[in-house]
Amino acid sequence: MTRFVLFLSCFFLIGMVVECKDGYLMGPDGCKLDCLMRKGTFCAETCSLRKGKDGYCYAWLACYCYNMPDWVKTWERATNTCGKGK
């Protein structure tokens, strides 16, 4: 019984450490990756290429992805460089 409790504790600890992020994909220009004029599966395919679990074209007409690795750059309001002429 003690081993089982220890196993469960380790399992939950690993689950808490290995987190994935969700967010809008960011293009090379620093803007959200648009999906307005693209095929319906564009966002899901693009998210998969970046090792995300799934994705869709959100109401803001930008690709939103789930469960992506931390190395994938996502758009954030605080670090927004879109339209600022780098």
Curated annotation (Swiss-Prot):
Keywords for this protein: Amidation, Disulfide bond, Ion channel impairing toxin, Neurotoxin, Secreted, Signal, Toxin, Voltage-gated sodium channel impairing toxin
UniProt modified residues of type Lysine amide: K84
Gene3D superfamilies, per the entry: Knottin, scorpion toxin-like
Superkingdom of the organism of origin: Eukaryota
Disulphide linkage map: C31-C82, C35-C57, C43-C63, C47-C65
Any GO molecular function: sodium channel inhibitor activity
Domain LCN-type CS-alpha/beta residue range list: 21-83
InterPro entries: LCN-type_CS_alpha_beta_dom, Scorpion_toxin-like_sf, Scorpion_toxinL, Scorpion_toxinL/defensin
Gene Ontology cellular-component terms listed: extracellular region
Family of the protein in this entry: Belongs to the long (4 C-C) scorpion toxin superfamily. Sodium channel inhibitor family. Beta subfamily.
Function of the protein: Beta toxins bind voltage-independently at site-4 of sodium channels (Nav) and shift the voltage of activation toward more negative potentials thereby affecting sodium channel activation and promoting spontaneous and repetitive firing.
Protein name: Toxin TdNa7
Organism this protein belongs to: Tityus discrepans
